[in-house]
Each structure stands twice: as C-alpha cells, then as structure tokens.
Amino acid sequence: MPEKSQSAAPIVRRQLSFDLTSQPWLPVLRLDGVIELVSLREVFARAHTLRRIAGDLPTQELALLRLLLAILHDAVDGPRDVADWYALWSADSLTAVAPYLDAHRDRFDLLHPTTPFFQVAELRTAKGEVFSLNRIVADVPNGEPFFSARLPAVDRLSFAEAARWVVHAHAYDTSGIKTGTLDDDRTVRGKVYPLGVGWAGSLGAVFVEGRTLRETLLLNLVAADTHGLRFADHDRPAWRHLPCSAGATPLELLVGRPSGARDLYTWQTRRLLLHYDGSGVHGVVLGYGDPLSPHNKHRQEPMTGWRRSLAQETKSGEQPIYLPKEHDGTRPLWLALSALVEGRPTDSPTPSEPASALRPRALNWISRLMAEGRLPLDMPLRLRAVGAVYGTQKSVIDDIFEDHLSLTTRLFHEQGAGHVQQAVEAVTDASAAADALGALASDLARASGSEPGPPRRALRERGVAALDGMYRAWLVRLAAADDPHKLRKHWQREACGLLLCLGDELLTNASDTAWEGRTVESVRGLLWLNSALAERWFHSRLAKALHLPAVSLPLEPPASADPAPREVALLAAHVIDSLQKSYLTGRPAAVTSLARLRNAEGGAAVRAVINNGGWSPQLNGMGSAAVNMRHAEKAVYAALSLWALHQQPRAEAMHQQSCREPALLGAAIRRLAPRIESSGPVRKRFVRLGNARTFPALIQHLRGLVALLQARNLPLDYSLLTADLYIWQQPGGRQAVRRSWGRSFHARRGTDAVPEAGWLANLHPSDDKDSS
C-alpha cells in the first residue's frame, strides 16, 4: 500500500548527507575471502587488493561495475588507444580517480538537497504518494523478495543498501504501468504506460573478470578506437549532464546520445527519489525516465553480443538492424562458447553482407590486447555472463541468469587458434551427445505409446547438465595442453562414458510396455521399435556424435566383479559339452540321459543325470562363496532341460560356443524371424519372454522358443543362457538379461563389435572330457 509523504522529509533532507565518495557502501570481496563495504574512493585505491564487487544480486554487481567503469573512463578521459590503456595497466595505481571524485563530489551525495545521486530532487506524484521499497528491491523469484528476512515487504534500507538499489533500478528496473509524477507529460489519468526495462535489462551482458578488481576494471576499459565501437568526444556520464527533471529529457538534449559507453553505463532510465529519516530509507517515488531503444546500439555498448533482426529490418526498411543478444536461461554459458571466443562475424554470405551476429566488443578488445602483446599468453580469466529474465510483459523479474567460464588469454590469441577450435568443437560434441540421450528418451516414449517431445527435452537438458562440470574442468586443462586435439579425444571418451551411464539408467527403468514396443513407420518401411532397438540407436547416435568408433554393445549381461555367473556358466558348458559329444557319437547312456532331461518337469531327473555323470561335486563345490547355490541349481537344471529339448533328435550340435559370434538367444530368435515386423507369433513370444515375472514363466516361454529353434535347426550357446538364467534371478537381473537379449536380437553382423575377450572367452574349456 502507498504511504503518505512525511512533512518532515524536506527538513531532514537539508540536514543529512551520504557522500558515496567517502562513505562505505560498495560491498567487495577481498583476496582473503572477507566481504566489507568500501567507498568509491577506497574501491579504486584498494582495487589491487580486492577480488571483485560482491553485490546483493549478480545484476547488482554488474550495475555497480558499470558505474565504476564510467567513473574510470571519465577520470582518465579514455583510454583513446592501446598505448593509453597499457600506461594504466603498467601503473602502480589509478591515480586519476581521487581528484576526479573530489571535483564531482556534490553529484555523488545520495541525499543532496538539489542533485541527489541518480535521483530527481522534489520528485512527487499528484497525490504525494510514497511507495514501498519493493519498487526498487528486485524480487527473485517472481513475487518472493530476495531478502527472506524482510518478508513480506522491504520496510527500510540503510543508506548504503539504498544507494546500491538506486543504481540497480536504472539498470534493471521492470517495465509495466507506473504511477505518473508531476511535470511528466506522459502521464495519462495518473499513470505512465510501459516504456521498457532498464537499459542493462535488455542485454545479455558479458564481461571479463581478472584476478583482482583492478584487473577486472582495466580489462573491461575498452579503448575508444576499438574496431566496431564509436564513442563521441563528448561522451560523458550522467553526473556531467544537467540534473534530470521529472519526465523525459527534452529531445533536443538527447541528440547524438547515447554518446558512448560512459553515457550508456549511467543512462537514467528512471526518475526516482528516496524518502528517509535519520536512520535510513523508508520509501521511494519511482517513475519512468529516458527510454532507450536497443536498435543498433552496438557501436556504443561493448558488454553484450548482438544479433541481426531481419524482422525489424523488414518492418523499418533499414539495414542492418542489430539487437542485443539476450542470454538463454536454460543453457549454460559454455554452449555459446563459439560466439565468445571466435572473433569473426558469423554467417556472412559475402564480405559486403552484414554479419548475422556480433561478438561482444569487450571480448574483441581482449583479442586486440593479445594481438598487440599487451597481456601474457596464459593469464587466467573468467568470462562472466549476467542477465535478468523478465516475466509477464516484463513487469516482473522471474529469474536472474549468472554463469561464468574459467579460461586463459590463450583462447584470445592466434597462438591459441587450435585450442579454440577444439574447445568449440567439443561444445558441438556435447550438444550432439545430449541430443542422442534425448532421442533415446523419445524412442522409449514412442515404443510405449507416449508423447515423445517432453521426454526428449527433459533428457537432453539432463545430458547437458551432466556434462556441465566435466566440460568446464576440461576447458581449464585445455589451456595448458600441448596437444589440444589429443585432449579433445580424451574429452569425447569421458563424455561417452558419462552419457552411457545415463542411458543405462533410463533403459534399466524402461517399462514392460516399452519392451513390447510398437510397429512404427520409418523411411525403410515398417519397423518394430522397442526398448532394445532404442538402445541400439542410442549407442549408434552417441558414437557418431562423439566421433568414436561404434560403441561396443555388451551382448551379454555385465558380470562386473561377480564371479558367480562365470562359474555357473563354466559348469553348464562342461556338462552340456560332454553330454552333447557323447550323444552325437551315439552312446546309449547319453541318449538315455537326454531323454530324461527332455521330459524333466522338476529337478529330480536333472539331479539324477548330474549324479550319474559325476558332476555333483562340481555343482556342490563351486569355488566362489558368492554363488547362490539355489539360483545356480535352478539355472543349470533349466538350461540342461532346454538343451535336451533342443538337441533331440537332431544329429547336429544345438549347443554351440564361439567367442567371435556367440549363439546368443536374441540373435538366434532374429534368425528365426528376420522380418520381425511381419512375424507376429515369434515377436509375441519374444516379448512375453522379456516380460516374464517369475522363473517358471520364464522357462515356459523359453521352451516354446527353443522348440521353434529346434524345428529350424538353429543352435544356441547354452553356457551363456545358463549365465543369463542365473543373473535373471539376482536383484535387477531381470532387466539386465532382457536388455542383453534385446541387444543381441538387434545386433547386425559386421556392424556391432563382438564382445571383448573377457569372462565369456573363458566359457569354452579346451580340455573337455567325455564323462558320459
């Protein structure tokens, strides 16, 4: 609610002073990590001992930095060129600032009776209203005051705090309808309708941060002769113009303005006046000042990138028209690295055609300093990006974007061209790899009959977020790398491993519906899309995105460090190899054993065959304590029974082992139905197998498929199947086995890497004995 103006305020205003040149009000972070308040005079005198400005918000920090830059530009009246700048860089201190502040001290008094700093004396509304300080203290997020201790409203501010928010208001105040002030001819029925946000609020601001505040100030102190910039000789900050009055400055006084960086850094986009008493500020009057169109300010504003607006060119008939390139709050800064470190204009069809985008001139300035040898080759820098994200017709601040990148000056020098190329191409790698993860989520959604768009976007963002820290750390290492190309190859492998883990998590949690899949249209006709095919596509896309050889698809469930599946598989291989050799040579005992195994419905018959063959000690005495004997027995018994069903009465070996092309279950079923899209019965059996929830149901579905394999004379590696059956019974094993069957089903000969020599290679003993 508005507060009534206090009658004592004019008396208090004449009695009090808050001199920003001598009073502590700027929050700074010292090199020792301590935050303190300093005056304008102190901040320049001690800049070499300070780390940075430490504002209440990132946007406030930038607004205060731009104020300091305007002071420094004006105090040195330049720099005009690199030589001027280097003299400042080489000097022990910024000696010109102190006398400059003395000369303009009256204009830096927050409470001055006639020229209060960045305010309009005697500003008032027609009703004499004084409004809550919420009008100038930014709410982040929307509707939630940043200072939670001051909920639900900001009732009072110290003079130091108020000074900071006054600077912030001119830079980032919201748009929307504001109460009109006396003598503002834009007022209609007591209101002034939206005229835009503060000037800095329209920017995707980027600046360079050095090791100290002194370095930061000088690195952003762009010379007047910088290519692409045009600073007028009469460029000066707000305090060297006539004091503002209520309403807009007369147009005749704005001719040729803004005149340069000093003018823009202090542009008076608002008219305001603080109301206070002896202990602080308790209210404010806030209205519109001088609105500023962002069109083609690229010759005066160095702290933002620019994009060419074809729509505005068509509308106005003027060419070219550049607008500030705002930050995308959903994307980390490193995804835009190309626009920051590559100095050439982008997408110019011909030399005479204006570029579609322009790099921030402040970064062109760093490149120029490097080209002229004014900065060391590997000096550490931070590129910082700050921006306000406005909501609802820009009448509120929804969020604040802040990000940074740590790198070195090498990336701004021609000697670092190779490093820049690898850094930018690694961003392309990351973006494409995140797209692959998003496509996996989309394919799984399609396979389950869901809308693919939202999962794609969500998983892509998750992929970018997962790569974020890895890329930033890699970029720091890149600066010192002798072989940037080799380091990028390392980055690609790291990124691949990370996104494979995320994809694995997604696939592990895929639903039974996604495993069942859908028949979908593709450029090659009908296609059965399920979670297994989605996984194959994911690996293919990821390998392509990261310029790696085809990602090796593990066709069997991972054994990790658990020796149990291998031990169980070795036993099954030994038993089945022996029985199969004896059966194929016509030994009666083996024929009898096979008949008993084939008709076995329980474990008794299988146990009898194992006992008669002398394999019981091996089954009961497996070397690893990690083996779950109950699960091992069930796996071995089931595998023997299935093999017997498969083998009898065939004269060829139905159990076949090979490290190079293992007869895996999924691959065998694919041979059974090469066109699975048109093989409904086989596909349904395979789906039911994968969705089986109990071990008896699993074996029942396997028996049906094995019968089909037997009829087609298609072999199977039963040692691997035994390992699958053992793993299936472990926690998480059902999904792992189903995925391995799906991978082998969709694997194509010659395009998928065969399993690497590992525990599977040891399943084929070379000293098989005939024990039947």
Positions of PLM-derived features:
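Extended alpha-helical scaffolding segments
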Residues: 1-141, 168, 174-558
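Long, acidic, intrinsically disordered low-complexity segments
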Residues: 92-109, 555-604, 708
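Aromatic- and glycine-enriched beta-alpha-beta binding-site module
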Residues: 147-175, 621-668
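Non-catalytic, well-ordered alpha-helical scaffold segments
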Residues: 156, 211, 215, 591, ...
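Amphipathic alpha-helical scaffolding segments
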Residues: 156-159, 163-185, 223, 287-294, ...
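Eukaryote-specific, cytoplasm-facing alpha-helical/coiled-coil scaffolding segments in long proteins
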Residues: 178-199, 297-298, 312, 621-623, ...
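A contiguous, surface-oriented mixed alpha/beta subdomain in the mid-to-C-terminal portion of proteins
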Residues: 259, 626, 645, 649-772
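N-terminal interaction modules that seed assembly of large macromolecular complexes
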Residues: 578-639, 643
